[in-house]
Amino acid sequence: MVMSKKIKEKCKKIDLVLTDVDGVLTDGGMFYSVSREELKKFNARDGMAVELLRRNGVSTIFLTKDDSKVSKNRAKKLKAKIFFGIKNKEKKLSELCKSMKINPENIAYIGDDV
């Protein structure tokens, strides 16, 4: 899949996408198997978007409050970094800007709790 010129132009300033997991990459629901294993439903289209971003030089980082093995596995599959157990996402954003030398205006954040 190739990014259209129109979308590419709009995204020129974006160097990094930060996204929450629960409620953004999932529907917010939690499922448990009979053995009490946590399960989450991820949308395949979101995975395709992360792949498309990577192919076009835009990294994706997952920021999540939870410490879910399921979320870690999803990040690994999509070759995205994940920071879990993050209670203060604004503080983590500031830390990432400094460590990665990225201006906040060059970051797209997708979340339901900031």
Model-found features: residue ranges?
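Non-catalytic pre-domain segments flanking phosphatase-related domains
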Residues: 1-21
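Short hydrophobic/aromatic-enriched beta-strand-loop microsegments
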Residues: 79-87, 106
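Substrate-recognition element of Asp-dependent hydrolases with the DxDx(T/V) motif
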Residues: 50-74, 83-84
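Conserved Lys-Pro-Asp/Glu-containing loop-to-beta segment of HAD-superfamily phosphomonoesterases
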Residues: 93-114
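Short acidic active-site motifs
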Residues: 6, 49, 92
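Short coil/turn segments at beta-strand junctions that form active-site/ligand-binding loops
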Residues: 13-15, 58, 105-106
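Short beta->alpha linker loops
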Residues: 66-67, 87-88, 111
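A positional/architectural concept
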Residues: 25-55, 65
